From Swiss-Prot:
Alphabetic keyword roster: Cytoplasm, Protein biosynthesis
Family: Belongs to the RRF family.
Database matches in HAMAP family: RRF
Segments passing through the bilayer: none
Organism: Beutenbergia cavernae (strain ATCC BAA-8 / DSM 12333 / CCUG 43141 / JCM 11478 / NBRC 16432 / NCIMB 13614 / HKI 0122)
Name used for this protein in its record: Ribosome-recycling factor
Protein's GO biological process: translational termination
Amino acid sequence: MIDDILLEAEDKMDKAVEVARDELGAIRTGRANAALFQKILVDYYGAPTPLQQLAGITIPEARVILINPYDRGAASEIEKALRASDLGVNPSDDGNVIRIVLPQLTEERRREYVKLAKGKGEDARVSVRAVRRKAKDELDRIVRDGEAGEDEVARAEKELELATKSHVDAIDDLLSHKERELLEV
């Protein structure tokens, strides 16, 4: 029972780190990155469809992204979705591919993105700590109900603390890497 609680907590903490990785990857840096387009949905024949399912995304240069629609009929909808996104990009359709040239980030914009990244990192840390708190409450309940001894639960709580620390450290590493990437000119 204790092992189940620890495994479940570890699994949820892993998911929190993965969500943080995805969210930080979606924050624009000075370089082109296909992860920027993960959350863009295109209205394809009335159904919201992820951009990756409708087009191939290539990065031929550091600040240029080419989007090659599998169905040319979807090109105008893809372009519309890109303009409506919060990425601040200006796509141009040359008939074969949609080309996006990412403008150079200003210092002010870089600072805004760092602040956004820190917010997402803090959200991830909070969710890891919430998982820890829930698991600790479960362990306390087990002791109260007499289902396990205090020594076993104390050992499990130490393991839980180690898991929490390693996951928070992983989030901090992701965040510091993203900050370096954002502030690099």
